[in-house]
Every structure is written in C-alpha cells, then in structure tokens.
C-alpha cells in the first residue's frame, strides 16, 4: 500500500500591521529654508514598494502632510532606516546637509535639527 500524504491547513491568518512614521520638519520650515510640500513630493516619487519607484504599492504606503510634519503609513514591511536614508538624500540634493541632521526623537519618528556649533570653541580660537 502507498503512503498517504496528510494535508496540512494553516488556520492562522496574519494580522495586517500598520507602520506609522513621522518626520518633524518644524524648525527648517518655519525658518523658510525648506518646503514641506516639496519634501512630501520627493518622498512620493522616491519610495520603493516591491522594487518599484513611485507607485506606493497601490495605496499600501501613504504619505500625509500636516503643516510641517510628514507622516508615512505602511501596511507592508517598511524600514524606518529607509526613511532616514531618503531624508538625507533630500537634504543633500537641496544643499541642506551641512546645516541639518536627522535625529530619532522616538521609536516611530525623526526630527530635523540644526547642527549645534559650540560658541566656546570659537572664542578660544580667537584668543590664540
């Protein structure tokens, strides 16, 4: 008699995970050196879903902007590090990389901050 194969059915379904990351661009937008709408368009054009640029997976990834905060929501695996990479790329493209840096201020968000230049070091150099 031939061996009988058992059919295994998986009853557990994966829950849809909703990843939500925010980028806080408040300081540069208020100072007028950066445009939040332009940055939102940059992210829309550059985010890759399934290896394709610009399609955002047919609504799987969404980008929303409220004043100077940009929120990226995703139903598929999406890396926070990838968002940082794209932000740095945008800053470099617009020659802002020398003044701004991307800092994680919580587990789900980044903030654009100015580099802190020490006044004390400059004063010491002037005295010499």
Curated annotation (Swiss-Prot):
GO annotation, cellular component aspect: cytoplasm; ribonucleoprotein complex; ribosome
Keywords: Cytoplasm, Ribonucleoprotein, Ribosomal protein
Recorded GO MF terms: RNA binding; structural constituent of ribosome
Keyword field contains Disulfide bond: no
Cell location: Cytoplasm
Nucleotide-binding among keywords: no
GO BP annotations listed: cytoplasmic translation
Primary location: cytoplasm
InterPro entries: Ribosomal_eL22, Ribosomal_eL22_sf
Protein family (similarity comment): Belongs to the eukaryotic ribosomal protein eL22 family.
Subunit structure: Component of the large ribosomal subunit.
PANTHER family: 60S RIBOSOMAL PROTEIN L22 (PTHR10064), LARGE RIBOSOMAL SUBUNIT PROTEIN EL22 (PTHR10064:SF2)
Biological role: Component of the large ribosomal subunit. The ribosome is a large ribonucleoprotein complex responsible for the synthesis of proteins in the cell.
Protein name: Large ribosomal subunit protein eL22
Organism listed in the record: Xenopus laevis (African clawed frog)
